[in-house]
Amino acid sequence: MTKTLKGESRDWLSPLFCWLYAAMLLWVLGLVTLGQRAMEGYYAHGFCVENWVLLLAAAGLTGLWVWRLRVRPAKLPQPASSVRMSWARAALYLALFAVQCLMARCLWFYFAFDPSAVRQGAEALALGQPLSEEWLVYFRQCPNNAPLTVILSLVYRLGKKLGLAEPYVLEVYGAALLTNLSVATAMAVLRRLKVRPSVRRVGFGLAAVWLLFSPFIIMPYTDTYACLFPVLGLLILLTGWKAPVRYGLAALCCSLGGAVKPSAYILLIAALLLGTIRFLFHKKDAALWKRGLCVLAAVIIGVLPGMALEKGSVKLLTGSTAPEEALGSAHYLMIGLDDQYWGGHSAEGVTYSGSFATAKERTRANLARALEEVQNRTMGENLHFFSVKAYKAYADGTFAFNSYLVEEPVRRSDRLSLFLRKIFYREGAWNPAYRAVMQCLWLMVLLGCLAAVLLRRREYAVQLCALSLLGLTAYQLLFEVWPRYLFLYAPVFLVLALLGVEKLGQRREKQ
């Protein structure tokens, strides 16, 4: 097993995950472009240009990027103070955060349904008020949102102490800050992997348009409040620290993110799977077994804080660490395999799950119904069903921000707010064009990911990213599907894409 971050693995099994992810990307790109007209009835994207045209544009822009890398070869690194560069980067991200806050101030509004429950629950906790019966029932059914509610209650309380007219705005700024930090961490991963500066600079510009100034920064919900943790776990796993330290800290990151958004655990699962494969292909000795046991112990210790946060938050809001009314993962598997709404939210599914008195009965019934859904379809029907779900997950480069419903709009009348609403709001005159640009950038990212898994499939960093994103896709195919669920791993998509672009540039230089 290699100890270098970009070195090649000796086993044959780890690169197989890259081949699987490459096949999945080709399938998705085919669905999004060639299958758009057949699939758009299941998910309306609202772009002003068809996806196949945007794919050609994305391929052309990527080709131009690679060509510029070839005609302008990397310069020798200039000596510079690492401390000075760190301060310069910090100042840059701080300035961008100020712009993000200005953008959020112009665009924020009150979201409906689950985000509304979290917002009102956090406000009640911060003010020391009891939860209404409506929200108490909600958190007993959906305890997965309890940790975020507790976290946001602390943010709301801080906003109250600062004397803000609407303390909720500080929660919005928190979403912008965590998105900012996730992009900064992705850039740190690329520096750690010694990706050439010219690639990082263009990649940073792409990240700024695609993520830093995405309308998602006004959404203080699970997607934004957990997006830092997977990419931070990735950075930790790529350090030169001892294995127990790396895996223990990565487990801590993923468990804290997983308390807010369970899919954050996927990166940790991928890392453990790759580590197990390398262990099996490595010559066994006493030192290796000892190191493996230390890693296992470190992971167990690392996940405890996240589990404590989750259980403690649920206990605080519902009075029980495991409410009998909780819908559970089996419920989301059931609605994820239901073809009535093609894996989307189902009110009938919630009613069905709520008809059982205990969690064990509900889980058993949900699993039986999920299996029945799959068995009642033919092989061709199942292929069509999962193709629709894959299309729904990957068909929107904005991660379907406009799918969020508005509970109460906040309409600022200044010129900047009016201008930004024309771009980012669904009813805005320029929103279709904005969505087309975001879709083109998203297709560029997917093409870069495809290049990375095909050309760098033996590198550990690529294998870890590919297996994580493959697991994320499997999660979308099996459970409830929403494009916004991909936002959590958007920084990981970015890292993998830039690794692919750099490799394309290197191959062009050799030619």
Regions picked out by a protein language model, each given a short descriptive name:
Residues 173-194, 232, 447-451:
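Transmembrane-helix motifs of polytopic, lipid-linked glycan transferases
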Residues 41-55, 170-174, 389-469:
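Membrane-interface anchor segments at the N-terminal boundary of transmembrane helices
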Residues 1-101, 291-300:
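Start-transfer (signal-anchor) and selected internal transmembrane alpha helices
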Residues 186-209, 460-463:
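Transmembrane-helix signature of polytopic, membrane-embedded enzymes
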Residues 137-164, 173-176:
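Short hydrophobic/aromatic helix or loop-helix immediately within or flanking a transmembrane segment
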Residues 116-141, 147, 341-347:
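Extracytosolic helix-loop segments that constitute the early lumenal/periplasmic catalytic or substrate-binding loops
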Residues 170-178, 205-237, 260-267, 485-490:
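Multi-pass, polyprenyl lipid-linked donor-dependent membrane glycosyltransferases
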Residues 131-132, 311-415:
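Membrane-proximal stem/loop segments at transmembrane-domain junctions that anchor or position
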